[in-house]
């Protein structure tokens, strides 16, 4: 049995889609003292992180756990009596996993011995590692490797440790390469003279039980680096357990494909003094089949072996953000700039700890997206981990408590016996070479001269526009809004046009590629509010020598954006510099596209051989005979070709393109390798619009605004995948193809997913030539086509919702006419191939049933849901109509992310129920309170939305009416954007935590997780099932939206058919399908659609666009403008009067769908719905599919693949609620108090494994007493210790939680009226404002209550706070981000980017240096004031007095003692719009209006200034 049992690709499953996350930890003695206790404590730490790891279908088989320690020299001398070991550090130990086959093992050992001797080293002997197979899980046992250790003696010529380590590395790399050639499985967990790794497919508590070595008292080390893994799959893979050879990694490398490609390109240019002739023996440097963590480890190890210090290597691979950081020293800035000219960052959420055995370091990614806390003790120990409380320590012995900050490093030097600070280590490394001098002297400046610009005068402009697919819609609905609005324009209602491969029309190649996005396993990042971590810097020219620092390396051109104006482009192509020659290649073809590509390759290679370093690919010389090669194909093909030839780093690829005009085009070109792009035809189009008077702006301003908008759009596209820098995005191929053949992908887009195959090179050529021919033949038409991508037009692109389908559906449901409904479904199903499901036909040979034998419509309809559409996006009338209808049917409506009015939780007098059965929890957490959560049958975590995955929801300010703001806890008239990520979900184990939180908040509700279809969503779904979700929703890219960038609507995500089938198949392969209910949504329109979804694996079904159409929507696609003419998607009281919908219409629609489903079931012979699920054997490709000129090339077999196993939900998840502290301890002690309202006061010990303390108790209060809760301080809970994550989440009024000690992330998440007090433990006597006492993302989405924190907090404190009043003694970066209410008093330092996106509430920050504080703030939305209002001063003083009373804060006490002076040191931070609204409201109230009327008048005044809204004594009624 082999130790690696990752299944081969089958159906839609691909092994390369696997992701992982984890908990990491380090326990070390700073002076290097080696003890067995360190090993024991490391193992204990591992067990305390068990909840951050994962288990699959076999609960006794972990996803992987292990530890990395120093070589235990005394232990090996005791155990290896028959091996003559040289002195310490003069021998290396290899930890090797072999197959259990003895003959295979002996063959491998023989080869390893030969390689050791060949390299001049000494084979000292082998040892079989004793293991206890009976102590591990069944699945782990079946795949358990045979573990052996090889001992290698150093030759006398290797004088130092690094030379010996390098030789061991060369031996291992050769052995690995030989193994690949021979097709033999073995794996070196480690091979070093300094460190050794013990790991496996184990749970944390199994590690020392399995490896008895670890129990021996002689097994000593000065440190233990530990890791507990959570994989998205359940397949046994021993080698993917951590630690790796140099590092443990918690996070994900989002740019991996690009990092691999660029390393591959560079390694053929490497020359190394350290390796000499051994360099070729170690290639390839990266094992591309490994996990992202192991590939990062490969890169880290190589640079260390090549002579870089570990800390230097970490700074190169994971640089802190420097381009926007004005606080950074010029030396450090120069270091980062120099290295950025040589290589791109390895970007993504990352906490790594690394070691070479002498130094141990840790570094956090630039965004601070992983937790990393540490204690330093008075007796010289450091405890570093993802969580505090993992090792017990006397508080009197703790010297200080801290956290690793974004981009910062912690370094422990065991030989020097001290911690080296981030500032010291980076300054030391940054000043080793004169980087600043080199940059000043060698960087090549390009200064565009406006006078020298080649003026673009195209006599054939219209022809060119037509040839490149320009339409009137492109210009009027995209190019002009881009510069007027300064961003990618918004659209709404989603995409209902066909995929490019299904379209009857010739399509741009760009349209076959879909942008990838982050969900669950890594977060999207916030490119708008957290812009300081992004960079658009671009380097041109040949790359320098990465291994040898030199001034020559920076002889390159630095650009601040990859979008080139004509002036910049002209300056580049005419530059005179010996190292920067340019050459233009015409990328055109006449008949043979393949020939055209080969000619381009030949010309490029020749140019590079002649010293050219700037290659310009131009289509400008197109004519009637010569067609442009699609620029995306030209760029990617050349990029891949040059990588294969080892030439890519010698040249930059610059594109002069007539086709590139949208954000998606630029993103795709950069993503596939373009260094810079000049969109000459877009500029010429602007010039035409200006010259002809249709655009009132100067040409220079238009070009500037366009370049800025496109650049920001590209950053937003990158950020959806969690990538911060254009440099990392370039060549990273963060796309998937839909409808491109495997041959084209392998040759020209290698590494890109294309799950269904598709069109070949000939068809790509035909599409380009068809457009080209039409452009040159179309002499009689002097105008562009109108265009119909976003809006239906007669004769244009097909749209599923068109006048015929809309009208027929509405009348059928209004009249309750099933025959008319059948006319609608005939039109929807049969007119065109609009969706992938239209490519299938049913097996006509099935034995039919009588209709009455089939499950009833009343039963089937209970599987139906309406989609997540928020109150705010929809009118009150539309939102409630959906809820009433679905509750009548026994189905479910979904609140969406805008909260819900509590009045709806009580049934109406007529028996109707307006309560949404599904309550959504999205990243904005609007209205998410304990009372909201307990009033649900299902709680849905929205990880992504089909129309805009990787982005937050948007509600424009003109739709945030007072009643909407009230439900959302925000400011009327101020636009709301949800953060792109859930700030408590940066990885799979974070999602598991939120699922656990919500299950605690409502034990009776199912927990649902909404994902968007993409390649790899199946593996993510498996991880979500392991994270104990009850329902998984796979949403299609074509889902509706109230407001989304057009780029996202068209170009992100996949059809649900692909994602659903992949999720179903992957869950079955993992043995997890029976644990979850699978649901799908995204333009489900008919009963046939439901049947197709069921056959592909769905059990439940969401409808959103169709029900809105039923209620009256006419697809005006103006939802975001608040101008909906039928009262569906507006808050405007006058327009809402036009609402004609009725819950009965929705009831009719749903029953019609169910009835049509029954007809199909009868025809196919299925008696019950469950029988039909996953039965893809009744489908085959339709005749229509076989006849279509493009769709006929698709391979649909992967969609229909059926693995063996259970196809439906069978067994509920085990949420382990019965093991929670609330159930075992708290609730029994306070149950009587909850029931009687009497006071209760209890004391409880707590540790980091006790998560979500207080939440279940709070939910019981909310169920009984509603939003009012209990009187203040009714239930007092006194905790002592280190609390686990989500301490006090969602606790309502009446509960007070005291914590003596410290806490992990998410304290007070969703606080709903309760009170939280955290103070330092008895005995810990360090200054509170110098010590970190709670973790990241505290009080996220909190709605009311109060809190007092006697110490510092981590990153993103009070994100989306909408009502809590809190005092804290210092916070990290991004504090008060997206805050909409409440007040935050900070008695200490704040981190960078304070108050970004803050639209409500007030912060009061104590500072000695106001200027320095202001430099840390995001100034976009806020004002600074001093504290002058006496009432306000008294409020702050009262908060400090309570803080002192609750926490004994010395800091607060000192401030109160000197209050007259102290108050002058506070800076008040208030959002501009919030202040304006408050002032307007007071003004209206002074004029005699009631509170309600004043708020409405203020809203009108601030959002609709043209209307006369002055209060003139006349009172207006407010419609609610």
Swiss-Prot record:
Binding site for FMN: 1060-1112
Amino acids binding [3Fe-4S] cluster: 1113, 1119, 1124
Pfam family of the protein (one): GXGXG
Cofactor(s) of this protein: [3Fe-4S] cluster; FAD; FMN
Annotated pathway: Amino-acid biosynthesis; L-glutamate biosynthesis via GLT pathway; L-glutamate from 2-oxoglutarate and L-glutamine (NADP(+) route): step 1/1; Energy metabolism; nitrogen metabolism
Assembly description: Aggregate of 4 catalytic active heterodimers, consisting of a large and a small subunit.
Family indicated by similarity: Belongs to the glutamate synthase family.
Protein name, entry field: Glutamate synthase [NADPH] large chain
Source species taxonomy: Bacteria, Bacillati, Bacillota, Bacilli, Bacillales
Encoding gene per record: gltA
